[in-house]
Amino acid sequence: MAQKEGLPAGRLSAMVIDEDKCHADSTSYMLSAELNFSVTVFTSPIKALDFLQNHAEGVDLVLADVHMEEMNGFDFLKVARELHKSIQVIMMSTETTMYTMKRCVKLGAQFLVNKPLDAGTIKNLWQYVDLKVLRMEKIKDLLQGIGDESTCANETNSLAENPKNDTKKKYYLMWTPHLQKKFLHALQILGKDASPKNIKKIMGVDNIDCRQIAAHLQKHRLRLTKDLKKASFTTDTSKDESNSRIGPAESHHVCRNASTLQPRSNTQPTETTMQILSEDAEYDDVYAAMRRALQYGIVFDESKHSSDPSGDEDEQVVVGGDQDGCANEANDIDSSGDHHQVAAVVTKPCNANASQEIINKMTNSDGMQATKGSKAAVFRLVDYSESDSD
């Protein structure tokens, strides 16, 4: 009979425990025919346990029924596993429920199959058998009795003394925070001249070699380069966002006026403003004084209203009365017959044209216009020569 593919070489032994004699015999026949098993049948679970107690190492597979009157199948499974821990048991039941399946597996069974067994189940039954355990059992049987204890001890000692036969174990170094701190300290000291050999000397750690330091140094530099690129990308992105928020016109205006936005002293603008205001006020005061002098017939002293201390103090404008020099008289007769006489006398120098120009300016500033039904102002320039007598 051809050997079943997947089964170990040699004939395996099996036990079938079932109180149903017909089903036990049919199962035994199919195991022998399909899988080439050497099968032993028991209709009493207690007798089967007595057999296992003396021949447990020679049994490779056990098929036991769950529902038996003499002894429950779960109790049989528990005792069988205690007698031989490596024995493989497959339970059979007419009710393959989830509860029954979980309980069988929990007690150490390989699988739960539906009863009665058919040819298809028997053909696939070997898939639930741990063939590795079966092979190890066969190897132990073959090695048993070969050589004495002294021979085995000598071979073991020779293997231990020869280091070439031992496989060298590889281990990985974990960079703890303490090692990382020493590594960064060494980099800070060495700077650009950092090499794995110099780093190892400064770190002073025995259980580390230059190759591991070189690998960690390369990773450290790659990490720094990556962080630098990420930081530059973040900065560029923030600048683009700020420019998009400001707008092209506003950003151009900000760039153009960035150099001019500098703090300046407030002293010079304040002084300039005060000076302009004082000059305007003084200018208004001069013309206001001239208008009052013409209105009330008093003497207008220009030196009192002059802002230049080095000005000519001899020039005066005299309003009213008879004075020497050039005189201008204005006579106005209104409808009521009242007479108004205004005379402006300018001394030093005595110039008729200059006097006429001054009078014209004063009349224009007062807004005097000849209108119908109102007072008409008439100005006449009188030139008195020195030869004429009063």
From Swiss-Prot:
InterPro entries reported in the protein's UniProt record: ARR-like (IPR045279), CheY-like_superfamily (IPR011006), Homeodomain-like_sf (IPR009057), Myb_dom_plants (IPR006447), Sig_transdc_resp-reg_receiver (IPR001789)
Major location category of this protein: cytoplasm
Known DNA-binding region: 169-226
Pfam families, per database record: Response_reg
4-aspartylphosphate: residues bearing it: D65
Function of the protein: Transcriptional activator that binds specific DNA sequence. Functions as a response regulator involved in His-to-Asp phosphorelay signal transduction system. Phosphorylation of the Asp residue in the receiver domain activates the ability of the protein to promote the transcription of target genes. May directly activate some type-A response regulators in response to cytokinins. Functions as a response regulator in response to cytokinins.
Identification of the protein by name: Two-component response regulator ORR29
Originating organism: Oryza sativa subsp. japonica
Gene of this entry: RR29
